[in-house]
């Protein structure tokens, strides 16, 4: 039986995600390893995330082991920056792929790494879930959810072993939001960008999963 999994928006709304100021420069903000907080409401009691260091740079290391309950880390965008952030950049690398994990297949929805990007308009939360899949097809969008309070799409951003190398990503927030939630309308209003989440898991496939997450840069 597939394991029920809430949307990140639900976690973000109801959990205690602390707002911690990110390191700032003139045109961007850096969300460092120390800024992430456990999203408590739907996370298990044991966090499998640690802060590691490579070449003097701290990063988040996720090491999920079978039997653990899934844990999500979150970062809440400061109120004054929610309309100012234009792009999100990050680096990640898959270390251990969950056995046969594919977020687009019911009952196999585990990922080596996940990045959630969330906006809010009124009472409705919009989330794009970018995953590093074990076997899923890169570029595929699936598991779409739409109701009066939540809209969410899952996008397979990367798939398969990465050879232990860091991979850089950049998401244009307005473009991504309009493409997924406004049918590509270039004039559609983009609501406030309110939060980011990260997760590695293997609970559905009952297998190990591991990944590293470097600093996130929020470009104003």
Protein language model features and the residues they cover:
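Extracellular/lumenal carbohydrate-interaction signature centered on repeated Trp-anchored short motifs
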Residues: 75-88, 160-163, 187-189
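Bacterial N-terminal signal peptides
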Residues: 9-20
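Bacterial N-terminal signal peptides that target proteins for export
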Residues: 1-11
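Short carbohydrate-recognition loop motifs
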Residues: 50-70
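Extracellular ligand-binding interfaces
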Residues: 95-165, 172, 209-212
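Extracellular carbohydrate-recognition regions
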Residues: 25-44
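Extracellular beta-strand elements of beta-rich domains used
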Residues: 196, 215-218
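Extracellular beta-strand ligand-recognition surfaces/modules
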Residues: 107-115, 159, 163-208
